Amino acid sequence: MCRNNASRAVALLHGAPARVETDGGLIAVEPSGSGASVDMGEPRFDWDAIPLAYAMDTAALPVGWEGLDQPGAVSVGNPHVIFFVGDVDAVPLETIGPEIENDPLFPEKVNVNVASVIDREHIRLRVWERGAGLTRACGTGACATAVHAMRRG
């Protein structure tokens, strides 16, 4: 279960704090207003924790696909690769997403994020979610992208 779904399930079914087992481990979910908040845990930047197939600098991977290059990689309970681009809508995520998701560099496959920094408080994001395809919302993708943006300065 993804963390978005875990938080919604707890909010809708229980309305009380809970701990939920996900593929990324046990997470704490707290009711919050009409929804719930999730403790995402610490992001992991080590190549073997993401995981990648071999050691490399996860702040700027020395790889590229069709005009997308030097992405960052981070695990927030699941693996993400993040590309900063000028226009997220110009990236053919429907075609390049599955190619990157299934690249041998990512032994557990990977979520593919393309992001544009709007200003210091806003990022526009599109996500190709591993195993699900293009998605309209991805909480771990938003967290991974924000962490990588802060990491890049």
Name each model-derived stretch.
Residues T140-A142:
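Helical hairpin unit composed of two closely spaced alpha helices linked by a short loop
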Residues M1-A137, V147-G153:
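Active-site proximal loop and beta-alpha junction motif in alpha/beta enzyme cores
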